[in-house]
Structures are given as C-alpha cells and as structure tokens.
Amino acid sequence: MFVLIVGAGRVGSAVAKSALTAGHQVSVLDEDPLSHERLDAGQSRSWEDSGGQFTVGTALETDALIQAGIERAEVFIASTAGDNTNLIIAQIAQKRFGIENVYVRVMDPARAGWYGEQGLHTISPTKHAIEMFERALQPELA
C-alpha cells in the first residue's frame, strides 16, 4: 500500500518508519528539509536506502503533493502541527485526488467532530489525553 504522510515531526516520522517496516511504500512531505533527520534517526540505513521517499515542500502547493506521490496514494495522513493546515490538505487529498483513507491529526477536540462529519478519520491526542485523565479520576468499581 502506498502511504503519503504530510508532516515529519515526532508523530509523522514515527508513523512513517513503522509503515515502512511493515512493508508499505511510504512517502513523507515536509517543508523543513532538516525534518528528514527524524526519518534517519535510529536507523541502520538512510530513509531513502530503506525504500522511503522524502519531499521538501509545502503541502498546500499541489506541485509538492504531486511530487510526493499523492496521485498514487491509497492512504493519506495529515500530521502537521496545525489543525487548519491539516484540514485543508486532508480535504484536498479527499476531494481533489479521491483518496478514501484520509487521517487527520487534530489537536483541538472541538474540531474533531466537525472533521469527522466531513468524512475524515480524526485522531486527537488532546481528546485522548482528556479521556485518559477522566478515567483515572473515576472511582474504582468494587
């Protein structure tokens, strides 16, 4: 399966490495050329030597998305640090390029529901943390 991940921060690079290890074709797009170092970190071979692709560019630019392989992507993951950017690029992937499996990292839990209504799969670390803390505060059932 061809996976395109936008954002090579902690989350994006970890998911990219995991997907490549699982045997998927993986392309990562990030505007910071130094973010490539996260993909190489802790590996015996470079990201490219391991079969990964890295493209420097802004995901809001169609040319960068095409260079990164969006036209053949079966899964699209938007994992930049910005909720607005993630929503826009996820909708581009979904509506313009017809990708059905679009996953979006959403920091603001209030937005996650709306994103879901747009047909996007949302992952909200903040919402997950809130739920975990709330469970920790519930009295144990006897």
Name the predicted role of every residue range.
Residues M1-A142:
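Cytosolic regulatory regions of ion transport systems
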